[in-house]
Amino acid sequence: PGFRGIRHIGARTQAAPEMSFVPMELMQESGWQQNFALLAKYNASFDLQLYPDQADDAVALFAKHSDIPVIIDHCAGPYFLFDAAKRGAVPAAEPALSHWADAVWKLSKLPHVSIKLSGLGMYHPNWSAQNCRVIFQTIVDAFGPSRVMLGSNFPVDKLFKSYSEVVDVWNEWLGALSDHEQSESRTGAASRAYRLNL
């Protein structure tokens, strides 16, 4: 009774092969697509870690299966932050930001798709409420607070921030929203996507 769905790390990009997790574009494989469709039979949701380059494949697949709740993990993989961090560049000024933002907006057009605000430490070891605010704002603008949920990505992100520091950033960002909108992102979005009573 505690089973809610499965999570797949399918992030892959030719732009940064060293940051790819799978050897091929699985969402293009017919067998993989058939297995994905089986999730509806078991009333299961699907978490996906992907990169912006894969948004078109994801949208094409998910549009055919509106009965399967989908959660996009780790902010839709803004891997451009990694290079920006190495150069000390401001993320909001990065040309690659628009490519990532386009992917976020494409995914948001599907009403059964939600997104998880998590995992930023993997892309920007020194991420903060200030330098990654554009990530939060883009995601909230695209999906709306009712389809944005918070995630800590612990213990992985413990390499970059303590749990309390991560929560402090979420609280600072959410502080710009109404009480109802904050409640949606803190519990409402996850409760609906994972069919929980929160």
What does each model-found stretch correspond to?
Residues 6, 39, 74, 115, ...:
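Divalent metal-coordination and catalytic microenvironments
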Residues 11, 77, 156:
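Short, glycine/acidic-enriched loop or turn micro-motifs at the edges of active sites
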Residues 22-149:
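Catalytic pocket-lining loop regions of alpha/beta-barrel enzymes
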